[in-house]
Amino acid sequence: MSLSHLYRDGEGRVDDDDDERENFEITDWDLQNEFNPNRQRHWQTKEEATYGVWAEHDSDDERPSFGGKRPRDYSAPVNFISAGLKKGAAEEAELDDSEDEEKPGKQEELPKDLGPKKLKTGGNFKPSQKGFAGGTKSFMDFGSWERHTKGIGQKLLQKMGYVPGRGLGKNAQGIINPIEAKQRKGKGAVGAYGSERTTQSLQDFPVVDSEEEAEEEFQKELSQWRKDPSGSKKKPKYSYKTVEELKAKGRVSKKLSAPQKEISQVKVIDMTGREQKVYYSYSQISHKHSVPDEGLPLQAQPPPVPGKEAKAPGFALPELEHNLQLLIELTEQEIIQNDRQLQYERDMVVNLSHELDKMAEVLEHEERAIANLSKVLELVEQCARRLQPACSNPLTLDECARVFQTLQDKYYEEYRMSDRVDLAVAIVYPLMKDYFKDWDSLKDCRYGTEIISKWKSLLENDQLLSHGGQDLLADAFHRLMWEVWMPFVRNIVTQWQPRNCDPMVDFLDSWVHIIPVWVLDNILDQLIFPKLQKEVENWNPLTDTVPIHSWIHPWLPLMQARLEPLYSPIRSKLSSALQKWHPSDSSAKLILQPWKDVFTPGSWEAFMVKNIVPKLGMCLGELVINPHQQHMDAFYWVIDWEGMISVSSLVGLLEKHFFPKWLQVLCSWLSNSPNYEEITKWYLGWKSMFSDQVLAHPSVKDKFNEALDIMNRAVSSNVGAYMQPGARENIAYLTHTERRKDFQYEAMQERREAENMAQRGIGAAASSVPMNFKDLIETKAEEHNIVFMPVIGKRHEGKQLYTFGRIVIYIDRGVVFVQGEKTWVPTSLQSLIDMAK
């Protein structure tokens, strides 16, 4: 903004001697033009003030100028300003009027656009200036001088290859027509009469000038034509923020978006200025104004930079700067908030459109559900009408099942959502009671199984994770079986005799896959087991002709472990019955044999050791071994129990009661010049009385090898005495044959065990991996049905403890150690198996 109009004297002239003096007096001209501040005023020169209308005008005055200030004439003598009285306002008004009367048409000669406003170039034209000096000549005949010459230019161009009608250059790339010039209409500045482009330029360069861009660029360079007093030629740089940048910034100014900082009251002492100031929050520092340092003492003012002229500081307006900055921030905040609001509204429109689509889908779904529910209600009401006693076409159970099947097939969702329990109670239960009113389950155990299976698929709630008595309110089928079917079963069980178990077992086998699990458990625990328990208490093994296993064992597939409480009283009664038993009575074996696989291995072995083995030992002790007249009945009574008692128990009986007497008879026979052929037959005859499993036992094998050694020593010791021909060779051959049989049997057993182990392996890779001793123990435990598992959190000397049946063991370098009373004792695998059994 130019302030040159402030540096004039009382007569409106600029003081050449003191350009920095400001005159703020209000003249009569200011009062007269109070409501017309844009009126241009003609400042009178010295000659006009002296001579008035008779003043002469130099040609320099008529020359157009871009500045409102008249250039100085340094060749003229020095003029002094008169210190006389200032002319009055009335006298100046007369001069203005006379001047206006003399020049009535000066304003009319200018174009319309330059009438009431200033040109934007910053200069002021006087009304008396009508044009530029020498600018009235027309350029229409430019270049016509070529007609009065010899055309040397045209000839030279043609010699250099120029072809008329084509452009200049090697490739004729030059322009064909000369550049046209357009004459300006008036005497105004550039752009005062609109665009000055010619028709040729519009054809060659069809780019439309943007008047808005030109105006913006013009306003940008408007105030930069003046020279900086400091002599700097650097142009000021302006920074602009677009709306897109503000949107990308996406945040509000910290001063306006963080009012919570005002809450923190912190005392801040500011000593950066001339005096100490105290603030009570950090946010107040941001509101501090930058005050000029005009009041600082000379000592506190910064020293001037050497080599540069000290620039006088202009007047600063910190309040104005703060207000402008605040307006900028408010505008930015408003733009950001409007952008956020616009984005929010757009998102809201998208969300509402999605909600509208969802609600349309929900509405359509609800309409379908209402239509389906109406049809379901119609079917249910039809069934209710047919259930009335006076109905001519009563509803049957099969027809009702078809109605429910229709509901499940066509209206599945509504059927699942409806309260099937109440619907079944109201419609199905009366029909079901009428269907089973004459039913005798022991005579016709499969009566009603098909219709109940159909109703199970229709009524059972398959979403229940666990079924129990608490499901009566949630499952219609369970409630149907409990309230309609169970009363008939209770009535039948009360009349049933436990010793006649087959009809009841067949009945439950027919219904076990139909009735709920908890209903079957209730029947077995509350109805069947009490009657069996009572019957076992009344059973006497000495007087009852019907063996107990005939009416207990049929319940094993259904009751399984539920019969465990009955086994103890059964063993007790059997043990009492065996007190006076003799091994010659084979009925005991017939009674006990069905229980071998029912009792646990440990309990069965304990029962045998307590009640059977002592009787067999007593019988074997009474056996008389006589090679000439042998009675084998007692031996047969003992060997007949081989499958009932364990091999170890049988071998123990033989070691204690048989082999000592047998070896003694052999020695006595060999000492009396025997017939070795008869001894060989006697040896082979006794050995054939034992099974391969007994013969494979190490103790039995040692006893027979001991007999062979005795026979070999007897043959070898009779040197010089009479010896039966071929006796020594026969005994040697017998020994070799027996040893070879033992070796072949052991090899066959090892091969059989290897084949079994290979079959248990899953895949070739598993079978190729060598097994360790722990795997071997695990295999043996599986073969003998013994539980083998590690003890959690228990170790001995860093070794994991295991339970093998009821025995605690640990494995160390291929050796099994068994926990004794005080120490750990090593044992063999076979002994471990025998102890576990």
Swiss-Prot record:
Ranges of Basic and acidic residues composition bias in the record: 1-13, 50-64, 103-116, 217-231
Modified residues (Phosphoserine): S2, S59, S98, S144, S210
Domain G-patch: 149-195
GO CC entries: cytoplasm; spliceosomal complex; U2-type post-mRNA release spliceosomal complex
Gene: TFIP11
Localization, UniProt: Cytoplasm; Nucleus
Annotated region (Required for interaction with DHX15), positions in chain: 1-50
Family to which this protein belongs: Belongs to the TFP11/STIP family.
Classification via SMART domains: G_patch (SM00443)
Sequence motif Nuclear localization signal, residues: 700-705
Chief site of localization: cytoplasm
InterPro entries on file: G_patch_dom (IPR000467), GCFC_dom (IPR022783), STIP/TFIP11_N (IPR022159), TFP11 (IPR024933), TFP11/STIP/Ntr1 (IPR045211)
Region of interest (Required for nuclear speckle localization), ranges: 710-734
GO molecular function, one term: nucleic acid binding
Full protein name: Tuftelin-interacting protein 11
